[in-house]
Amino acid sequence: MRQLAELLTDLLGPVPTMFLWVIVSFAFFRALQFIVRWYLFGKWTWPNFNFFDIRNRIRRRRRGGQEAENTENPPENEAEAGEQVEQEPEPDSRDLSAIPPNKKWRISNECVSLFHSVISGLWAAYALLYYKQLVQDLVNYRCDVAINLVLMSAGYLFHDLVDLLVNEQSARIIELLFHHVVVLSAFAVTMFFNRFLGVVVFGLLMELNSIFLHSRSLLNLYGVDKKSPSFRIIALLNMVTLFAFRLCVSAYLVYFVVVSIPDLEWYVSIINGLVIASLASTNTVLTYRLLAADGLLGSRRTRRTPAATAETQVGDVESGPLRTQVEDEDHHTIGVQTIHGTTEDATQTV
C-alpha cells in the first residue's frame, strides 16, 4: 500500500494524489451506502423528504381554511381572530426526528456512519498510541498513517454531505451540515498547510464515542424500549465515551489553542480557535441533549423513544409515511400527525 502511494505521488504529485484518495474513499462509502440499503431493505433509493415543502403546504392549507371559516363565521374582533390562528402550533422539523418519515434511509445512513466511526475511531487511537510524536508535537509532526486517516474521513464526510442533501431537507440536518463543514475545514488546513495533523487526529478520537451514539440512534429507530438491558448498556457506554472522548478531548484542544497562541501566527490562532470552539460548542449541545433524552435532567425534559406505529414499522413501509407520491392533502396529514404524535429524541439529530 505504501509503495502504491509513493508511486502515485511520483506520477501525479502530492496534491493530486491526496484528491485521488479522497475520491476513492468517497466512492467506497457511496457504494457501501447502496449495498447496505439493498441488503437491509431490497431497495436502492427512496423518495426525497423535504420538511420545508410540507410546512409551507400546511401553512397554505391553514390560511385557506381560516379564510373559509372567517367567511362563514367572521370573528367579532381582532383578538378572537388571532386566537383562531394560534390554535394549531407551528410545525418544527426537529420533532420529525422521533418518527422519521424517511425511516429506512435513516437506518441505512446510520449503519454506514457506524461503520466509519469504528474504523476511524480505532485508527485514530492506534495512530496516537504508536506514534508518540503526534501527541508531543501537535503542530508540525506528520506521518502517513495519520494522513491516510484524514483522507479517508474526508471522503466519508463528502459522502455523508451528499447523502443528507439528496435525501432530506429539514432543520435537523443543518446541525449535521455545520459539523461536517467545520471538520472538513480542519482537514483542509492540515492537508494544505502541512500543520496541525496531531490536532486533527485527536479530534477524530471523538469517533470512538460516535460508535455508541450511532448504535443508540439505531436502537431508537427500531423502537427498542429504553428500559431494555440492551438500550441501557448502550446508553451507559455512550455517556462514558462521551465524557472521555468528546468532552475531555475538547477541553484538551481548547487548552492547546490557548497555550499555543504565543508560538503561532495570529491568523492561525484565530482559525484554530474558531474550529475548536465550534466543535466544543456542538459537543456541549450534544451532551445536554443526551442527558435530557436519558432523563438525567428531570422527567420534564425526558424524550420518548419513537412510537411503533403501523405507518412507521420498518418492515411494513417503503419509506415511512412518504412511501409513495402523495397528494397535497396527504402531505398535510403526514406533517401534522408526525409532529403531534410524538416527542423528539434529539440523539438522532447528531
From Swiss-Prot:
Q: How would you summarize where this protein is expressed among tissues?
A: Ubiquitously expressed.
The record's subcellular locations are: Cell membrane
Explain what the record says happens when changing residue 116 to Y: In et50; suppresses the glucose intolerance defects of paqr-2 (tm3410) and mdt-15 (et14) double mutants
Could you give a single Gene Ontology term from the biological process aspect?
phospholipid homeostasis
Is Nucleus a UniProt keyword of this protein? Answer: no
Where do transmembrane segments lie in this chain? 9-29, 111-131, 145-165, 173-193, 195-215, 229-249, 270-292
Q: Which InterPro entries match?
A: TLC-dom, TLCD
Keywords for the protein's UniProt record, in alphabetical order? Cell membrane, Membrane, Transmembrane, Transmembrane helix
Which portions of the sequence form the region Disordered?
65-100
The answer to whether the entry has keyword Ribosomal protein is no
Q: Which residues form the TLC domain?
A: 102-279
Cite the SMART domains for this sequence: TLC (SM00724)
For membrane topology, the record states: Multi-pass membrane protein
The outcome of changing residue 290 to F is: In et49; suppresses the saturated fatty acid toxicity phenotypes of paqr-2 (tm3410) mutants (specifically, withered tail tip morphology and glucose intolerance)
Q: Which GO terms describe its cellular component?
A: plasma membrane
Q: Where is the composition biased (Acidic residues)?
A: 75-90
Function (record text): Regulates the composition and fluidity of the plasma membrane. Inhibits the incorporation of membrane-fluidizing phospholipids containing omega-3 long-chain polyunsaturated fatty acids (LCPUFA) and thereby promotes membrane rigidity. Does not appear to have any effect on LCPUFA synthesis.
Concerning PANTHER family, the annotation shows:
CT120 PROTEIN, TLC DOMAIN-CONTAINING PROTEIN-RELATED
Q: What is this protein called?
A: TLC domain-containing protein fld-1
